[in-house]
From Swiss-Prot:
Protein name: Transcription antitermination protein NusB
Highest taxon of source: Bacteria
Gene Ontology biological process: DNA-templated transcription termination; transcription antitermination
Annotated keywords: RNA-binding, Transcription, Transcription antitermination, Transcription regulation
Source species of the chain: Burkholderia multivorans (strain ATCC 17616 / 249)
GO MF entries: RNA binding
Alphabetical list of SUPFAM superfamilies matching this protein: NusB-like
Keyword RNA-binding: yes
Pfam families from the UniProt entry: NusB
Protein function: Involved in transcription antitermination. Required for transcription of ribosomal RNA (rRNA) genes. Binds specifically to the boxA antiterminator sequence of the ribosomal RNA (rrn) operons.
Length: 145
């Protein structure tokens, strides 16, 4: 199945944030490398820029929002899980136009693509709790049918 431009953007953002978490390179350096990455030409560049630079800029705030939904310190998560959860937290807080179920599904798919064998289950559970806190009206409406 062909990937959407938005999915491609999220995949590239995951790769960039993974690199940032491990190397602490500047967002400009990571951005420059991503521009040469396979699939960049098919990505939604505005979304990629918003996610990559937004997560790096607001890292501390996103970690604060995410931490209460975790069952362990964030630094004990794999870099892939951290990157995916930070992207989803950013989208839940800044891209209200994207339904929370889409944000969670995209994060689960990213975790399946890049993470360990069961990492996607953890990502799903964390984001389900987080979405209920960050978007209570939307999640409640969904649960009430």
């Amino acid at each position: 199945m062909k990937k959407s431009a938005r999915r491609q953007s999220r995949e590239l953002a995951t790769q960039g944030l993974y690199q940032w978490l491990l190397s602490n390179a500047s967002s400009g350096e990571i951005d420059a490398q991503l521009r040469g990455a396979l699939g960049y030409d098919k990505a939604d560049k505005a979304l990629l820029d918003a996610i990559l630079h937004g997560v790096i800029r607001e890292h501390a705030t996103l970690v604060d929002a995410l931490t209460p939904s975790l069952d362990r310190p964030i630094d004990q998560l794999s870099p892939v899980e951290r990157a995916v959860l930070l992207i989803a937290t950013f989208e839940l807080t800044h891209h209200i136009e994207t339904p929370y179920r889409v944000v969670i599904n995209e994060a689960v798919e990213l975790a399946k693509t890049f993470g360990g064998s069961d990492g996607y289950k953890y990502v799903n559970g964390v984001l389900d709790k987080l979405a209920a806190k960050l978007r209570p009206a939307e999640t409640q409406a969904r649960r009430n049918g």
